[in-house]
C-alpha cells in the first residue's frame, strides 16, 4: 500500500487550505493507516491552541485536529526550525507532534510515496 504524507505549510484561516487538508486527511485515514502528517513553515500555526477564527468570520476547525487519536493518526511531525523562527518552541500544541530539524524532516518525508500539500 502506498504511504501518503499530508504537509501543512500555510497559516490557518487565511484560506480554506488548512481546513480542506484536514478534511482530506481524516477521509483518507478511513482507507489506510499508512499516513504521515507534517507541519512546516506557517503550517505550524495550524496547531496553536486558543485561536479565535470567529473574529475573522472563519470556521473553527482547529479543534478537529484533536481527533487524530480517534482516527489512529499517530505519525505526526513538526519542523523545529519553523518553531524557532516563529518563537513557538515552548507551546503546547493541540496534537502531539514530534519536532524534527529540516534535514531529518526531509528524510522522513522521503519515506512516503504520495505527498499532498495544503
Swiss-Prot record:
Q: Which Pfam families match?
A: DsrE
A GO cellular-component term linked to this record: cytoplasm
SUPFAM superfamilies in the record: DsrEFH-like
Q: Which UniProt keywords apply?
A: Cytoplasm, tRNA processing
Q: Note the Gene3D superfamilies from the entry.
A: DsrEFH-like (3.40.1260.10)
List the GO biological process terms. Answer: tRNA processing
What HAMAP family does the record point to? Thiourid_synth_C (MF_00389)
Q: How does it assemble?
A: Heterohexamer, formed by a dimer of trimers. The hexameric TusBCD complex contains 2 copies each of TusB, TusC and TusD. The TusBCD complex interacts with TusE.
Put simply, this protein is called Protein TusC
Q: What organism is listed for this UniProt entry?
A: Salmonella paratyphi A (strain AKU_12601)
